[in-house]
Every structure is written in structure tokens, then in C-alpha cells.
UniProtKB/Swiss-Prot annotation:
Keywords carried by this UniProt record: Glycosyltransferase, Transcription, Transcription regulation, Transferase
Entry coiled-coil feature ranges: none
GO MF annotation list: uracil phosphoribosyltransferase activity
Family: Belongs to the purine/pyrimidine phosphoribosyltransferase family. PyrR subfamily.
Function: Regulates the transcription of the pyrimidine nucleotide (pyr) operon in response to exogenous pyrimidines.
InterPro entries recorded: PRibTrfase_dom, PRTase-like, PyrR, PyrR_bifunctional
Annotated organism of origin: Rubrobacter xylanophilus (strain DSM 9941 / JCM 11954 / NBRC 16129 / PRD-1)
Gene3D superfamilies linked: 3.40.50.2020
Name the record gives this protein: Bifunctional protein PyrR
Motif (PRPP-binding): 105-117
Gene encoding the protein: pyrR
Length: 184
């Protein structure tokens, strides 16, 4: 996990690749259990960037567990963020190949921190239609919420200080799986 710290001082390795896989299997089972009566209306939407491969991994788990193909989309929240401060943001674009109206949509992200990303994701998703329900799955919840948002599915709760950061690495985006805490 040498690359995950991005040159910063790594304070702790909190999830290995095997632990990430185990957490995602558990989250997948929890999603299936909670939505058992309406699995045909279930969809996953990964929040760019690392939420997308996590959503695909969860969909793969559900396929293996139940033989069910759950549609997966990618959501770019850039234009819905409240912290752009006049910047010229890079918009990568969303790709949601299904109607969200009437579906139970599980938004997937790597880290839940202040709640602002989740709020922006809900705004972006609601522009595409009115889901029956929106749920939130995160690999890591590090606390320090600024908005009244909580995840429905959490891989691991990691208490952190405001001076620390949580870095998630995934094979698909970073070449390796792992979660580290960096900073003071």
C-alpha cells in the first residue's frame, strides 16, 4: 500500500484488499436482505470516481449470490457540489443506462465524511427522475458530518480527526486495494 498515502505520512492501514472484499460481500448481502421484496427494481449508482468500481463489485456479488443482474450507473456530481468557489470544474459526465423513476437506487461511494458529496449526488440523481427510494452504501464512514446524512450500508466506521484524511485505493483506479489514514 505504498502508493495509497500519496507521499503523505500513513498513520494506519485500516482495510486490506481482503478486508475490502469481505466488507463489500457483507454490504451486498445487506442490500439483498433489505430490498428482498423489490429486487427487480433495484439499481446501483456509483459516485465518480471510486464509487463506480465499488458499485460494480457489489453488482458482481449480487450476481454470484442470487443470479440477479442489477443495473449499474455512474454519477458525476461535479456541477452539484457546493464548494467549487468559481473554479472551472472538470465534468466527466454521468452514465446511467436505466430509468431511475420508481426504482430503489443505492448510491455507492468510497468515503462518507461531511455528507456534502451524498447531498450533491442526491440532487444529481433526482434530476433524472424520482426514485421510489434512495439508499447510500459506503466503504468507509469517517464521521464529522456537516449535514444530516447517514449511510444505510457501511463497510467500516473509522474514527478520524479533522486533520487526518482517509485514502481509498482500488485496483480499478489505483492499481491496488487498501484504505489508509494519513495526516497529523
Amino acid at each position: 500500500m505504498s502508493r495509497l498515502g500519496f507521499g503523505e505520512r500513513v498513520r494506519a492501514c485500516v482495510l486490506t484488499g481482503d478486508q475490502i472484499s469481505r466488507s463489500l460481500r457483507r454490504i451486498s448481502h445487506e442490500i439483498l436482505e433489505r430490498n428482498a421484496s423489490s429486487l427487480e427494481e433495484l439499481a446501483l449508482v456509483g459516485i465518480l470516481t471510486r464509487g463506480v468500481p465499488l458499485a460494480h463489485r457489489i453488482a458482481g456479488n449480487i450476481r454470484r449470490f442470487e443470479g440477479l443482474e442489477v443495473p449499474v450507473g455512474a454519477l458525476d456530481i461535479t456541477l452539484h457540489r457546493d464548494d467549487l468557489d468559481g473554479e472551472d470544474p472538470e465534468v466527466k459526465g454521468s452514465h446511467i443506462p436505466f430509468e431511475v423513476a420508481g426504482r430503489t437506487v443505492v448510491m455507492v461511494d468510497d468515503v462518507l465524511f461531511t455528507g456534502r458529496t451524498a447531498r450533491a449526488a442526491m440532487d444529481a440523481l433526482l434530476e433524472r427522475g424520482r426514485p421510489a427510494a434512495i439508499q447510500l452504501a459506503v466503504l468507509v464512514d469517517r464521521g464529522h458530518r456537516e449535514l444530516p446524512i447517514r449511510a444505510d450500508y457501511v463497510g467500516k466506521n473509522i474514527p478520524t480527526s479533522l486533520g487526518e484524511s482517509v485514502r481509498v485505493g482500488l485496483v480499478e483506479t489505483d492499481g491496488e486495494d487498501g484504505v489508509v489514514v494519513v495526516g497529523s
